[in-house]
């Protein structure tokens, strides 16, 4: 797709990003809850989730240790990604990892390599910041995202399990 551009997010993008994030969360939750109703209680959002995401994204746009990217088609936002550098558990030799926290492309534009474009820019930024390893979390039931990340070379590292007490 020749008309795709990837750019760093700006503070003026925040309201638009909240809209993309809301669409992302609704679709994400529809996928994971439909396949596993036990997850429902774990993905219910607080009433002020939009405001929290706005503030979190704003802090990441301003941070030298984070990268927020916007994917545009003919100048219209169609997706975004967010990544940041996080400290690893102190006992391990790898001090820091790059964490890909969000990746969303509008459904109409999926399957066209746009997420790979976002990933490539994100990984280049991580390498520039001397980060040797990237990590991502994915719900077991989100098979599309799981397969994308596997195709990008991610491997299974840890499994988080939960139980109601």
PLM features per residue range, with description:
Residues 26-56:
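Conserved GNAT-fold acetyl-CoA-binding loop/helix
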Residues 102-105, 111-124, 151:
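Conserved acetyl-CoA-binding loop-helix of GNAT-fold acetyltransferases
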Residues 116, 140-158:
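Conserved active-site alpha-helix within GNAT-family acetyltransferase domains
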């Amino acid at each position: 797709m020749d008309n795709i551009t990837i750019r760093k997010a700006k503070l003026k993008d925040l309201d638009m990003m909240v809209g993309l994030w809301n669409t992302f969360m609704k679709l994400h939750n529809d996928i994971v809850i439909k396949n596993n109703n036990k997850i429902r209680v774990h993905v219910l959002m607080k009433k002020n989730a939009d405001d929290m995401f706005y503030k979190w994204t704003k802090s990441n746009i301003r941070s030298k240790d984070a990268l927020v990217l916007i994917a545009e088609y003919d100048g219209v936002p169609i997706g975004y990604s967010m990544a940041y550098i996080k400290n690893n558990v102190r006992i391990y030799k790898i001090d820091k990892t790059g964490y890909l926290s969000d990746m969303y492309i509008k459904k109409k534009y999926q399957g066209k390599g746009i997420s790979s474009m976002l990933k490539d820019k994100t990984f280049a930024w991580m390498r520039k910041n001397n980060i040797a390893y990237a990590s991502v979390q994915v719900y077991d039931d989100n098979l599309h995202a799981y397969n994308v990340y596997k195709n990008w070379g991610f491997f299974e590292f840890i499994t988080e399990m939960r139980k109601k007490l």
